[in-house]
Amino acid sequence: MLAKRIIPCLDVKDGQVVKGVQFRNHEIIGDIVPLAQRYAQEGADELVFYDITASSDGRVVDKSWVSRVAEVIDIPFCVAGGIKSVEDAGQILTFGADKISINSPALADPTLITRLADRYGVQCIVVGIDTWYDEESDSYQVYQFTGDEKRTKATTWQTEDWIKEVQLRGAGEIVLNMMNQDGVRNGYDLRQLKQMRTICHVPLIASGGAGTSEHFLEAFRDADVDGALAASVFHKQIINIGELKKYLSEQGVEIRVC
């Protein structure tokens, strides 16, 4: 069995790490490189960086900090933000990223997933999916341009259908960003994760809602996700990664303990 992964998420805006609640009202957390170093030293398995306004601004992620991060950490990291072409992805990988993640650009042009997978291999192509639970219809819907609350909009895709589609097109991993839970720290949406796990045959990463060590355990044990991504609990030092991994290991979760 592959070890489960703990993945700090760093949302980047104007060259700094920020964090919002339900993708709104972002506050500045700190500088990119020192935070990346801290998480690597604490025992993170991987880091994810989202340049959250790149797609909505019509630009590609700023590559200058990508190379700086690559110089100071020795764990894999994934970068997302406005990657619309094979060439965009190639530059970010050349600057030192191990994976690239696409979200809104994949919704605009689903063939991009296949072109990236064909060129660089499925192992480094991640598709991020921003999913919103609508109580009225009791359904999960995919949103795009979520980095800018003024431009955020619903798509015509139901989350389940989009998960199936991106796998057919060559996604090597899926990060499910559960918008309702984002930043509120009351637990991952286990119902949604369990439902999507049944149709997701590539690694599935849970994102949105972690507030306690028990929440990570529930995601791994009850929904069988491959990794758990979190931001605010790590940024605000509510949870220490090393202590979290020790707890998970004691609970029987297969995980790399530092």
From Swiss-Prot:
GO terms for cellular component: cytoplasm. The keyword Amino-acid biosynthesis applies. Its main location: cytoplasm. InterPro entries: Aldolase_TIM, His_biosynth, HisF, IGPS_HisA/HisF, RibuloseP-bd_barrel. It comes from the Bacteria. One of its GO terms (biological process) is L-histidine biosynthetic process. It catalyses: 5-[(5-phospho-1-deoxy-D-ribulos-1-ylimino)methylamino]-1-(5-phospho-beta-D-ribosyl)imidazole-4-carboxamide + L-glutamine = D-erythro-1-(imidazol-4-yl)glycerol 3-phosphate + 5-amino-1-(5-phospho-beta-D-ribosyl)imidazole-4-carboxamide + L-glutamate + H(+). It is found in: Cytoplasm. The active site is at D11, D130. Its EC number is 4.3.2.10. IGPS catalyzes the conversion of PRFAR and glutamine to IGP, AICAR and glutamate. The HisF subunit catalyzes the cyclization activity that produces IGP and AICAR from PRFAR using the ammonia provided by the HisH subunit. Belongs to the HisA/HisF family. HAMAP family: HisF. Heterodimer of HisH and HisF. This is Imidazole glycerol phosphate synthase subunit HisF. It comes from Yersinia enterocolitica serotype O:8 / biotype 1B (strain NCTC 13174 / 8081). The lineage of its organism: Bacteria, Pseudomonadati, Pseudomonadota, Gammaproteobacteria, Enterobacterales. The gene is hisF.
